[in-house]
């Protein structure tokens, strides 16, 4: 069984990759260089793909800074500073317009080309920043796109979108990753680029806060280095 796995280099996508491997899939990882602010994640994606010994790792490059619209693609927009409790109140400025639609479309084309049966994505609807494209109704709609928009789908063999983390809290994702052997020290969750050696995560953005809180909830130390 072949599976394309969306791999950002973050905690969730890395766990999704290791889950796909545990499920017996022959894994083809796909990452995206869209000129994002947090380019450190690409180095992490390469490291994770190597550690997981994927069959192939593709990095697709395109430029979403051409129109910006997000703090992750426009450095003139400040990263938000808010509490975890405030994260579900509204869609934040770190939302990249239609990002998962774009990513899944690339993954679908890749999967159909290599005759993969599945596409894994590490979206999560419980501990998240309020993004609309991490929710079950979005995934269900994209599954229909996979069915209707491909030769395989029209012939009755639609590529399946697998979301093994969608109903897990961040702490449960870490527990699963621990069981699967995910090398957390190679992952990168921060919305800033980290600069320096070793790179330092900011500790303040939504993603850092959720990650740190989950490790703390489990009584574990996050192996990443933080500026604060």
From Swiss-Prot:
GO terms for molecular function: ATP binding; ligase activity, forming carbon-nitrogen bonds; zinc ion binding. Its EC number is 6.3.4.20. Pathway: Purine metabolism; 7-cyano-7-deazaguanine biosynthesis. ATP binds at residues 7-17. Keywords: ATP-binding, Ligase, Metal-binding, Nucleotide-binding, Queuosine biosynthesis, Zinc. One of its GO terms (biological process) is queuosine biosynthetic process. Zn(2+) binds at residues 190, 202, 205, 208. Binds 1 zinc ion per subunit. Catalyzes the ATP-dependent conversion of 7-carboxy-7-deazaguanine (CDG) to 7-cyano-7-deazaguanine (preQ(0)). It comes from Acaryochloris marina (strain MBIC 11017). It comes from the Bacteria. SUPFAM superfamilies: Adenine nucleotide alpha hydrolases-like. Pfam families: QueC (PF06508). It catalyses: 7-carboxy-7-deazaguanine + NH4(+) + ATP = 7-cyano-7-deazaguanine + ADP + phosphate + H2O + H(+). InterPro entries: QueC, Rossmann-like_a/b/a_fold. Belongs to the QueC family. This is 7-cyano-7-deazaguanine synthase. Coiled coil: none annotated. It is an enzyme of class 6 (ligase). Signal peptide: none annotated. Its cofactor is Zn(2+).
């Amino acid at each position: 069984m072949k599976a394309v796995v969306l791999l950002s280099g973050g905690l969730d996508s890395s766990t999704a990759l290791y889950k796909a491997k545990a499920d017996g899939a022959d894994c083809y990882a796909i990452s995206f260089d869209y000129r994002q602010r947090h380019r450190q994640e690409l180095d992490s994606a390469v490291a994770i793909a190597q550690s997981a010994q994927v069959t192939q790792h593709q990095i697709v490059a395109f430029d979403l800074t051409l129109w910006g619209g997000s703090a992750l693609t426009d450095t003139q927009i400040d990263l938000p500073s808010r509490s975890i409790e405030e994260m579900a109140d509204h869609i934040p400025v770190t939302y990249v317009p239609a990002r998962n639609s774009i990513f899944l479309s690339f993954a679908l084309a890749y999967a159909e080309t290599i005759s993969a049966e599945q596409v894994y994505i590490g979206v999560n609807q419980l501990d998240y920043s309020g993004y609309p494209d991490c929710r079950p109704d979005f995934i269900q709609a994209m599954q229909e796109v996979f069915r209707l928009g491909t030769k395989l789908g029209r012939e009755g063999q639609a590529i399946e979108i697998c979301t093994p983390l969608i109903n897990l809290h961040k702490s449960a994702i870490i527990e699963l990753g621990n069981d699967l052997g995910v090398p957390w020290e190679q992952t990168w969750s921060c919305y800033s680029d980290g600069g320096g050696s070793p790179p330092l995560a900011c500790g303040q953005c939504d993603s850092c806060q959720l990650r740190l809180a989950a490790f703390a909830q489990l009584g574990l130390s996050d192996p990443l280095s933080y500026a604060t």
